[in-house]
A protein has these predicted regions:
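Catalytic cores of the polymerase beta-like nucleotidyltransferase superfamily
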Residues: 1-150
């Protein structure tokens, strides 16, 4: 999403991007299993020189409540995690398949293309977290329209 904003506003493709998120779903919720994936992916992508944030969506309920002081139920697939993202414009997932890619975007791409940050009023929504994220984005992309939560 931020890369798209950068293209639309004529900025460098990596401008303002702190990290790249990679998420997957593995029923093995052990830290050891996730750590293996993190290390393998980092080794494969290390040449890019960017920070990669890799998370098993099956494990999110184990750490999210302590980090964000909000409840988070166990998920049954990666798209369940996307459905709970803080903003609708970030609710985009791409998965490689044998013959191409599958894209999951429950709210479409209009907000991404329109440089709009819109809250996702899900059960784990935090107005404070949204305000902080929107303020960071607005400082980097002043063209951004930020929709206030209801």
């Amino acid at each position: 999403m931020q890369s798209v904003w950068n293209v639309l506003t004529g900025r460098a493709i990596d401008y303002g991007i702190a990290d790249y998120d990679v998420f997957y779903f593995d029923p093995d919720t052990s830290w050891d299993a996730e750590d293996v994936v993190i290390r393998k992916l980092q080794a494969r992508l290390d040449h890019l020189g960017v920070k990669i944030e890799t998370r098993n969506q099956a494990r999110v309920h184990l750490w999210y409540p302590a980090k964000h002081s909000l409840p988070y139920p166990p998920l049954s697939c990666s798209t369940d995690g996307i459905d709970r993202f803080l903003t609708q414009n970030t609710q985009v997932g791409v998965r490689r398949t044998d013959d191409g890619f599958d894209v999951y975007a429950p709210h479409g791409f209009d907000d991404v293309a329109g440089l709009i940050a819109r809250p996702n009023p899900g059960p784990n929504f935090s107005a404070a977290n949204y305000a902080a994220k929107a303020a960071r984005w607005r400082a980097l992309w002043p063209e951004l329209t930020v929709i206030a939560p209801e």
